[in-house]
Amino acid sequence: YLTESFFTELASRELKVNIILFDAKEKGIDKTIGMSLCVKNENMLWGRYWGSEKNIDNLHFEACYYSPIEWAIANKIKYFDPGAGGSHKKRRGFIAKPNASLHRWYNLPMDSLIREWLPKANKLMLDQINATNNEVPFKFEEPKLSNT
């Protein structure tokens, strides 16, 4: 999880101009209970991290979809990518798509296990992405993803 020191360090770097934070507060209480972290450039806003202290209906939607979309429109950002995970994205008007990530394992036995397992996991994920996109109630021009 991202710690307070992460945000303190982030605020002291030049990268902060590319970071947008959306915080959520309960009505009448001036205490942050949830937050989403997005990264931006001149044309794109990417949702990348979210967390909350409380489980409140629609808090995730507000912090990760509604507020970032509203901000992107107000700031003339052309594209919004809400981030990885979840077949729930189709209900929000987004297609499922793969996201790349980079990891390094310093434990060699673990590295070996993950290298063996990863192609199988990637195939299962692409199958799930294609199945999800077959159910979206709108047209889109993304090509089908290959399992090879």
Predicted regions and their residues:
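A conserved beta-strand-loop-helix scaffold within acyl/acetyltransferase catalytic domains
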Residues: Y1-D57, V136-T148
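Homeobox/homeodomain signature
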Residues: G28, M35-L37, E70, R92-I95, ...
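Acyl-donor binding region in acyl/amide transferases
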Residues: E42-R104, L108
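Terminal substrate-recognition subdomain of acyl/acetyltransferases
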Residues: Y79, G85-T148
